[in-house]
Amino acid sequence: MSVTAKDIAKKLNISAASVSMALNNKPGVSDELRAKIFDTANEMGFQYSKKMLRKNHKMIGVIFIHKNFIFDSAFFSELGNSIEYRLKEYGYRLNAYHIHEHCDISLELQKILKDDPDGLILFGTIMTDSEIRYFNQLSLPVLLLDAYFPSFTGDSVVINNVDGARAATECLIDHCKVCPGYIRSSSTFPNLRERADGFYKAIRDAGYHSSQAIVHEVIASTENSYADMIEIIDRKEPLASCYFCDNDEIAIGAIRAFRERGIRIPEDISIIGFDNMSYSSYVTPPLTSVNVPKAYMGKIAADRLLDTIRSEVHYPIKIAINTDLVIRKSVK
């Protein structure tokens, strides 16, 4: 005779409803009791249905939407590793999905949903408001990471870009006693617009006019920012005595260009980056940078999504992760 949920409930002296919720991976049962139910079911030789087997292969999908942007930087690697590590602690595996430019998002989502994920984490760094609507229509929990859109109906975990950029700019003003310059990305992602807001807020609060800032626009990678800054220096464009940069890659490329043209860092020009990548402490000179706690950010994103999966009632929230400034040797 086959073992039933009632048999398991009788052995554990709990309700059959609790057993059913656990075996069907539904909320309402503690993790400890859920584990005990599965252990007992296995000991008694319980035969799982195909649906149960599928639902108990717990899986979270992580979606990257590519345009003229590749998620290959150390920032996204550290963030993704943190998410995967946290999910494994709770018995979930992670599947990564890539939706490339010109792909039909609706069709790609249909393919993803065939894998029956319990929830989705969406890297929204380069997304637009019009693309978010596809994810609002889904019946499973979706968390938006590294972006925020008021129209999105799920949770969002973002960086406090404005305050981070403002703190970096204020540091330059305090140390250099002049209006800082800005080496900004040619991209216009929401994160970068927020960093620009923080930069300009800091210089205005210090009594400078926005037009006083010397601004250079570069392509946001180490090699491209190096090449762009070499051209700017060789054209003899005006240079500031200190700069805030949109990210560490830009800052490191700029430092290389300045040093190759005989400009000393920080004696002649001070520089601050953003992201505090692991390699930023190894460049010459070690880079002062706005630290984004990437491991913590990934953990918070994973925890919040799992909470939503387990909960019967959901109230969307926006979580802003604060930054701190790591002082090294690139500011005099």
Predicted regions, residues:
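Hinge/beta->alpha junction and helix N-cap segments in small-molecule ligand-binding domains
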Residues: I65-E78, A96-D104, V157-A167, I183-I230, ...
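N-terminal helix-turn-helix DNA-binding module of bacterial transcription factors
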Residues: M1-N56, K332
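Periplasmic-binding protein-like
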Residues: P117-F123, G181-R184, V215, E237-N247, ...
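Alpha-helical recognition/docking segments in bacterial nutrient-uptake
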Residues: H57-E170, I233-P238
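Alpha-helical structural signal in soluble globular domains
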Residues: T40, S82-R86, Y134, E194-G207, ...
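Flexible loop/turn connectors
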Residues: D228-K332
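Glycine-rich phosphate-binding loop signature in dinucleotide/nucleotide-binding domains
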Residues: M44, K114-D116, H175-K177, I232-L239, ...
